[in-house]
Amino acid sequence: PPELRQEIDAMIDSNYESVNNGVYKSGFARTQSAYDEAVTALFARLDELEALLEGRDWLVGEGAGRLTEADICLFPTLARFDLVYVVHFKCNLRRIIDYPNLQAFVERMIDLPGIKETCHWHHIKAHYFWSHQNINTFRIIPLGPLEGAHTR
């Protein structure tokens, strides 16, 4: 919606560097300090988003908010987080399932018409663990996790 454009863009920008790109900064860090900086920023922003979603359904808008591009941009990263990023990219301070509001957000997104059908969890996991041989030398694809959004 045009009246929310600035708020939507600001939310997308706030999430991109520390969350959407932050998981990759963590996973492909070449130094301990680069990793520490990326993980710290990532979880600081996840903590902020958890607080923001208290009593709300969506990231932007009045009251409970309304579904916008900001939600759609954040969803893939959160949906893949416990399945891939916690282990593969060492983003393991907490899982999304440990954040009740973020977990509920992911579940709400998955329950939207047409979303669940596009989430091919095994493919997502296989792609990440197979394609980044430099950080997963033997291309082992883990069996877990056994709980989370991917089990819905």
Go through each PLM region and give its residues:
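C-terminal alpha-helical interaction module
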Residues: P1-R152
